């Protein structure tokens, strides 16, 4: 069984409010990684992100900071063109205080460009999570395994796959794909079966080889998320 870090997702509006800081501090013992989502801003800039990071850095000794721009194609709010999205991700490397950066994977990506950006981020000591999200369904087992395989070829620190289950077999397939990957590949793996049906994938992540599990601070930011305080308590049972 692997050690699992708990990620708390936040989606602030305009700036980091003191009430949000208080909510984070109230759950500080449950948070290993704080995920700052930035796709909710219509035209987010690197300067805006840097300002938010500065506000959060006061607490940074307590957790790592992950920055994510989730595109609309993969279930987020972000409507940047692909080029604008990749330029933003690349520019995040220059912000001190960011520990981890999420970059999305799609079957039709420019492989060489993606690899250049990932290598660039790593040269600035950013851990990379390459991720893929399917909010409609769970592909068959062999396709799940293939997606994990394709993502790990970029040599990221983490590969993350989140899918929507429609029955218990979908959940089992995701867990099996994650378990097999963790036994055979070097990089860390994250597998999420979304919604209440797939909650076990969040709470028992480490049993199946997963390294990160995502929770919320108050209102869920994705289907099936629970508050990080409850999630931490569940994860430590295994």
Curated annotation (Swiss-Prot):
Reaction(s) catalysed by this chain's protein: 3-dehydroquinate = 3-dehydroshikimate + H2O
Q: Which residues bind 3-dehydroquinate?
A: 35-37, 70, 202, 225
Q: Name one Pfam family in it.
A: DHquinase_I
**What sort of enzyme, by top EC class, is this?**
lyase
Q: Which UniProt keywords apply?
A: Amino-acid biosynthesis, Aromatic amino acid biosynthesis, Lyase, Schiff base
Q: Which InterPro entries match?
A: Aldolase_TIM, DHquinase_I, Type-I_3-dehydroquinase
Please provide the Gene Ontology terms (biological process) for this protein. 3,4-dihydroxybenzoate biosynthetic process; amino acid biosynthetic process; aromatic amino acid family biosynthetic process; chorismate biosynthetic process
The terms under GO molecular function for this entry are: 3-dehydroquinate dehydratase activity
What are the positions of the active site? 133 (proton donor/acceptor), 160 (schiff-base intermediate with substrate)
EC nos: 4.2.1.10
Its pathway is:
Metabolic intermediate biosynthesis; chorismate biosynthesis; chorismate from D-erythrose 4-phosphate and phosphoenolpyruvate: step 3/7
CDD domains per record: DHQase_I
Protein family membership? Belongs to the type-I 3-dehydroquinase family.
Q: Which NCBIfam families match?
A: aroD (TIGR01093)
Instruction: Tell me how this protein assembles.
Output: Homodimer.
What is the purpose of this protein?
Involved in the third step of the chorismate pathway, which leads to the biosynthesis of aromatic amino acids. Catalyzes the cis-dehydration of 3-dehydroquinate (DHQ) and introduces the first double bond of the aromatic ring to yield 3-dehydroshikimate.
Instruction: State the name under which the record lists this protein.
Output: 3-dehydroquinate dehydratase
Q: Which organism is it from?
A: Staphylococcus aureus (strain MRSA252)
**Highest classification ranks of the organism:** Bacteria, Bacillati, Bacillota, Bacilli, Bacillales
């Amino acid at each position: 069984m692997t050690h699992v870090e708990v990620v708390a997702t936040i989606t602030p509006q305009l700036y980091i409010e003191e009430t949000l800081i208080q909510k984070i501090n109230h759950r500080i013992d449950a948070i290993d990684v704080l995920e700052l989502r930035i796709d909710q801003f219509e035209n987010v800039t690197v300067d805006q992100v840097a300002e938010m990071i500065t506000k959060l850095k006061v607490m940074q000794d307590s957790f790592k900071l992950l920055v994510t721009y989730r595109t609309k194609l993969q279930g987020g709010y972000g409507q940047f063109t692909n080029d604008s999205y990749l330029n933003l991700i690349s520019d995040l490397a220059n912000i001190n205080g960011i520990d981890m950066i999420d970059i999305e994977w799609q079957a039709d990506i420019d492989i060489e460009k993606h690899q250049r950006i990932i290598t660039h981020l790593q040269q600035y000591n950013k851990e990379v999570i390459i991720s893929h999200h399917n909010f409609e369904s769970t592909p068959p087992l062999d396709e799940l395994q293939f997606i994990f395989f394709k993502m790990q070829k970029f040599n990221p620190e983490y590969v993350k796959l989140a899918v929507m289950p429609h029955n218990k077999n979908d959940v089992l397939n995701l867990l099996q794909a994650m378990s097999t990957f963790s036994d055979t590949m070097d990089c860390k793996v994250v597998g999420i079966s979304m919604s209440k049906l797939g909650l076990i994938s969040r709470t028992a992540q480490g049993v199946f080889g997963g390294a990160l599990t995502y929770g919320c601070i108050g209102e869920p930011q994705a289907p099936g998320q629970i508050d990080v305080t409850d999630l931490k308590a569940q994860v430590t049972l295994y």
